[in-house]
């Protein structure tokens, strides 16, 4: 089978989860992605065949980049067609992002069994373009806003083995002892979290602050100033552009402060941790708000819109969780109830069913 995924953790982590499941079922798995996506392939099983393909986006870059984009995509489609003729996949699964265009387009032209998985509550641009050109759509967030006449199947968002192994891990509620707070802005970090979270934490009462240890994922360009701010304000913090061990840190955390990308919400709910979610306001179709809504309504998270995410507002919410162990425990339990640890297996069954149907036609 072939998996195609775009260049962010939001696309790559669920793709990794499916690769792990399909390899365990005895499948040969190939992944196609771009150079950005290749940064996230370190966690994929070693037996996954990984190929970087030519693709481009119309959403970023200047006029020159937009002129070149169709030619890059066309070259990627041609390469995918040639590759599929040499090694015909039984099924092609796209996880969104521009790097999935070549594989999905080639699968459409060759009439191969094909499907997409949409992690968010709103279809991304590429998944929207292919929604009526695939055999099935798996949805990670429910309900998902789908084009008229298009049906989706709710599988949930698959999570990596490292997350699944920690499903409903025991939660230590906040108290007068060392506490962990994890701050993650998605796989690419988030500037607003680097702007508002450090002063919010630094303003907490000293009795609470002395117990806190912060793990803060910040962008490369923000790392130094964030680390300096924490140090100057007496906050124990580890600041890195990317944590390879997020599953461990999330499991040990009393509170997680995060964007509400679909993968982050899935990880939080499978492990079961209280969270403060700050949806990315510029996300396509405001899909991060849609992603957060279910977990918030279930009682597992607090949502703070980006427009209201001041240091004062965040400090109040952080304090409300860490100063109330009973409420924090209830949030952790609610998050775990909301989780769908079976999502990976459901998606794997869907993939196998589609491949089987393709063999009969």
From Swiss-Prot:
It catalyses: di-trans,octa-cis-undecaprenyl diphospho-N-acetyl-alpha-D-muramoyl-L-alanyl-D-glutamyl-meso-2,6-diaminopimeloyl-D-alanyl-D-alanine + UDP-N-acetyl-alpha-D-glucosamine = di-trans,octa-cis-undecaprenyl diphospho-[N-acetyl-alpha-D-glucosaminyl-(1->4)]-N-acetyl-alpha-D-muramoyl-L-alanyl-D-glutamyl-meso-2,6-diaminopimeloyl-D-alanyl-D-alanine + UDP + H(+). GO terms for molecular function: UDP-N-acetyl-D-glucosamine:N-acetylmuramoyl-L-alanyl-D-glutamyl-meso-2,6-diaminopimelyl-D-alanyl-D-alanine-diphosphoundecaprenol 4-beta-N-acetylglucosaminlytransferase activity; undecaprenyldiphospho-muramoylpentapeptide beta-N-acetylglucosaminyltransferase activity. Its EC number is 2.4.1.227. Keywords: Cell cycle, Cell division, Cell inner membrane, Cell membrane, Cell shape, Cell wall biogenesis/degradation, Glycosyltransferase, Membrane, Peptidoglycan synthesis, Transferase. InterPro entries: GlcNAc_MurG (IPR006009), Glyco_trans_28_C (IPR007235), GlycoTrans_28_N (IPR004276). It is a peripheral membrane protein. It is an enzyme of class 2 (transferase). Gene3D superfamilies: Glycogen Phosphorylase B. GO terms for biological process: carbohydrate metabolic process; cell division; cell wall organization; lipid glycosylation; peptidoglycan biosynthetic process; regulation of cell shape. One of its GO terms (cellular component) is plasma membrane. Pfam families: Glyco_tran_28_C (PF04101), Glyco_transf_28 (PF03033). Its main location: membrane. SUPFAM superfamilies: UDP-Glycosyltransferase/glycogen phosphorylase. It comes from the Bacteria. It is found in: Cell inner membrane. UDP-N-acetyl-alpha-D-glucosamine binds at residues 8-10, 120, 160, 187, 288. Pathway: Cell wall biogenesis; peptidoglycan biosynthesis. Belongs to the glycosyltransferase 28 family. MurG subfamily. Cell wall formation. Catalyzes the transfer of a GlcNAc subunit on undecaprenyl-pyrophosphoryl-MurNAc-pentapeptide (lipid intermediate I) to form undecaprenyl-pyrophosphoryl-MurNAc-(pentapeptide)GlcNAc (lipid intermediate II). This is UDP-N-acetylglucosamine--N-acetylmuramyl-(pentapeptide) pyrophosphoryl-undecaprenol N-acetylglucosamine transferase. It comes from Roseobacter denitrificans (strain ATCC 33942 / OCh 114).
